[in-house]
Each structure stands twice: as C-alpha cells, then as structure tokens.
Curated annotation (Swiss-Prot):
<feature type="domain" description="TGS">
    <location>
        <begin position="312"/>
        <end position="398"/>
    </location>
</feature>
<dbReference type="Pfam" id="PF06071">
    <property type="entry name" value="YchF-GTPase_C"/>
</dbReference>
<keyword id="KW-0496">Mitochondrion</keyword>
<dbReference type="InterPro" id="IPR027417">
    <property type="entry name" value="P-loop_NTPase"/>
</dbReference>
<dbReference type="InterPro" id="IPR012676">
    <property type="entry name" value="TGS-like"/>
</dbReference>
<dbReference type="InterPro" id="IPR013029">
    <property type="entry name" value="YchF_C"/>
</dbReference>
<dbReference type="GO" id="GO:0005739">
    <property type="term" value="C:mitochondrion"/>
</dbReference>
<dbReference type="InterPro" id="IPR031167">
    <property type="entry name" value="G_OBG"/>
</dbReference>
<dbReference type="InterPro" id="IPR012675">
    <property type="entry name" value="Beta-grasp_dom_sf"/>
</dbReference>
<comment type="similarity">
    <text>Belongs to the TRAFAC class OBG-HflX-like GTPase superfamily. OBG GTPase family.</text>
</comment>
<dbReference type="InterPro" id="IPR004095">
    <property type="entry name" value="TGS"/>
</dbReference>
<dbReference type="GO" id="GO:0016887">
    <property type="term" value="F:ATP hydrolysis activity"/>
</dbReference>
<dbReference type="InterPro" id="IPR006073">
    <property type="entry name" value="GTP-bd"/>
</dbReference>
<keyword id="KW-0342">GTP-binding</keyword>
<feature type="binding site">
    <location>
        <begin position="26"/>
        <end position="31"/>
    </location>
    <ligand>
        <name>ATP</name>
    </ligand>
</feature>
<dbReference type="InterPro" id="IPR041706">
    <property type="entry name" value="YchF_N"/>
</dbReference>
<feature type="domain" description="OBG-type G">
    <location>
        <begin position="17"/>
        <end position="283"/>
    </location>
</feature>
Length: 405
C-alpha cells in the first residue's frame, strides 16, 4: 500500500488484524494471552508444550475518541475496533527442522500479521526454563534463528521454482524480466538472512515491486514484532530489570526496528483475578516497592496500541443515533477503500464522503449540531482518492441514493 512520498508498506495486513504470541516454552505466553484477552482460554502450565493448538480471541483496541464520540452523538451503543490474538505453541531449538512442535509452530506464525515475542526476565526456581537458566538475549536469538532458518529454506524452494519457470519462457518476455527481478531480490535477502538479520529490516523503504514480491511469499521474518520482557511484578511497577540493557543492545544489532516493552504476566493475571488493586497482593507489592496506586496500572492497553502502530493501522468512525462504530484500516487507505471495509457494495457504488476531523469535535458538548459544523466549514466533501486520516468521522454516499451511516 502506498502511504505517500513513494513509500509502500510491507506486510499483508487485513482490516481484521491478527497477531500471534510466540516464544520459548514456559516464558509466560499463555498467562499473557489470558490477561490480554481477559479470558480463561489457553493453558498456562509449568511444563513445555502445554499449548498445542493455537487458541484465539478478539481484544478491543483502546480508543479515547470512541467513548467521546459516543457521548457527543448520544448513540445507543458503540462498536470498538478489534485485534485477534493467537496463543501459539512454544518453540524449541530445531523447530525449523521439525523438532518439538516446530512445523506447527512455524505454520501458525505464517498465518498471523504481527508477532508478540514473549521472553522471560523473571527468576523463579519453581518455574522451569527449557534452556536451563534465564537468559532473554539467548532466547531472543533462538527464536530469531529458527525463523531465519525456516525463511532460508522457504526462499531456496521459491528460487528453485523460479529457475525452472525462467527456463521455460523467452528471455525477452515481460514474465522473464519480472522473475529476474524477483530472483535478484531473493538473492540479496538470502545474504541478509545469513547474517542473522530479519527480512523486515533489510531496508527502511521498499518500492512497489519489492512489496508485491514479499507480500506474496509471506516470509516469517517480514512480520512486525513487539518484544515483551516478562518480569516480576516488582520489576514491572519500578520499570526496571537487569536484562534490559543487554536486550536493547541485541535489538539494535540484530533486530533494529522491533519494539520493546516491559510487562508482568503475573501482575496482569492478579489484576484480572482481583478485578483491581484493592487486595493484599497489591498491598504487598506497594510495600515492597514503595510505589503509589497510580503506578499499579496494566500494560495491556499500551501493548495493544503498540501493535496497532506496528501494523500501520488507523481508525475511522461512522456515527449516528444507533451506534458509533470504529473501523480498522491501514495507513494510506482511500475513502473509497474505507467504504468497502463497511460493505463491498458501498465501495462499488461510492460517490463521495462527508468527513469531519475528530479534533474539531472532541471538545463539543452534546447534542451534536451538524448545522453549526456546516456553517463553520468543518464538514468536508471527500472524493474517491482522499486518503483517510486517523480518527476521521465519515458519512459515505453511494449511487442510487443509498447512504451508509
């Protein structure tokens, strides 16, 4: 997708975005899954491969504009945008060769659009570590190496198929030239992978031909990644951990562009279980760390919003007396394409859209006075090629007098 300035976005991101939770066994993936989805799905247990089949659940994307627009429009209900989360089986060394649940693990990753990579940063003797000791940098390297090895295998298979096809068509044909360009890109990516680097970080800006090639093949290391260091509740509320510096150094060298956050699966689990911080458990944390109630907050909203940003997602809203609806779209989406997210017919019959900027509305008091907005020139007519902006409010108009609110 072209987001302007000749920049094209890498990745096959849908309007119903998905992310998978990955990492070694026993690092807190399933506990994190339960916390982020506010459910009892998943199987957090103190042994490897407690999760076999990937669980999934939808989570709401936090949105201040959504609740504010509900108030301004006095709508009967609101429908938030969502992100589908998968709890994927734990990885082990040799996964790319099929060891453990390797083939299933890697196949599950191929079907998601973003990756939450959980690494263990807490010390607890009663919770075993599959590698024998806690070392998040080693764990990051193990997972990345397995993804790279699988991509190298996949890349070689693609190149062999291309080589056979190229011998069957004229060297002067357009098809041959396209396959030659693809082969040259794959050769460059292979060298990059051999250096222990992800495809996603091969370059900062991709051209349209490169994006088409990479999105077609859906390489594992082309997916955006949010690294989550699972620490003790005490480290989390103090926002410190002895492994942080080494992790940041590793990211800068081997995975630049990946984002990194601290969280505590135990803290989030207790927060969900106790339905707040009014409990002896959190009183003990405050006593141990000398922090205030204001510091005992969940990391989940920030984690979801960070993944939203990594997936290059924005939102637009349709508003009316029945509902305020938040819709996921990707940066660079046109007004006509956004209409198609609501219904494919609306894209085909699109005429125009009336667009209001959220910033022009957010301080207004209900009930909304659309006549006042029009008199101030705050309702803009947008054509097919208008590029939607984050938090736009849109009323789409279609042929045949059909209007979708």
């Amino acid at each position: 997708m072209n987001i302007g300035g000749g920049k094209f976005l890498l990745g096959r991101i849908s309007n119903n975005p998905t992310s998978g939770i990955v990492g070694l066994a026993n690092v807190g993936k399933s506990t994190f899954f339960q916390a982020i989805t506010n459910s009892k799905l998943g199987n957090p247990a103190n042994y490897p491969f407690a999760t076999i089949d990937a669980e999934c659940a939808k989570v709401n994307i936090p949105s201040v504009p959504l609740s504010n627009l509900l108030r301004i429009y006095q709508s009967a209900k609101c429908v938030p945008g969502t992100l589908t989360i998968y709890d994927i089986a734990g990885l082990t060394r040799g996964a790319s060769q099929g060891h453990g649940l390797g083939n299933k693990f890697l196949n599950d990753i191929r079907h998601v659009e973003g990756i939450f990579q959980v690494v263990r940063g807490f010390l607890k003797e009663d919770i075993t570590h599959i590698e024998g000791n806690v070392d998040p940098v080693r764990d990051l390297s193990v997972v990345q190496d397995e993804l790279i090895l699988k991509d190298l295998e996949f890349l070689e298979n693609i190149r062999e198929r291309l080589s056979k096809k190229m011998r069957m068509v004229s060297k002067n044909s357009k098809e041959h030239q396209e396959m030659k360009i693809e082969t040259e890109l794959l050769d460059a990516l292979e060298e990059h992978l051999f250096n222990g680097k992800k495809i996603r970080h091969f370059k900062d800006h991709w051209n349209l031909d490169e994006v088409k090639i990479l999105n077609k093949h859906n390489f594992l290391t082309s997916k955006p990644t949010l690294i989550l260091l699972n620490v003790s509740p005490q480290d989390y509320v103090r926002n410190e951990n002895k492994f942080v510096r080494n992790i940041i150094e590793w990211i800068n060298e081997f995975s630049p562009g990946d984002k990194f956050l601290l969280f505590s699966a135990e803290f989030e689990s207790q927060l969900m279980e106790c339905k707040g911080i009014a409990s002896e458990y959190f009183d003990k944390i405050k006593e141990d760390t000398n922090v205030s109630d204001q510091q005992l907050v969940s990391a989940i909203p920030q984690i979801i919003l960070e993944m939203r940003k990594l997936l290059n997602l924005i939102s637009f809203f349709t508003c009316g007396p029945q509902e305020v609806h938040q819709w996921n779209i990707r940066e660079g989406t046109t007004a006509q394409e956004a209409a198609g997210v609501i219904h494919s017919d609306l894209r085909e019959t699109f005429i125009s859209a009336d667009v209001i900027k959220y910033d022009d509305l957010k301080k207004m008091e209900p009930p909304l006075n659309e006549s006042l907005l029009k008199s101030k020139g705050l309702i803009k007519r947008a054509g097919k090629q208008y590029i939607m902006q984050d938090n736009d409010i849109a009323l789409f108009k279609a042929a045949g007098g059909k209007i979708k609110k």
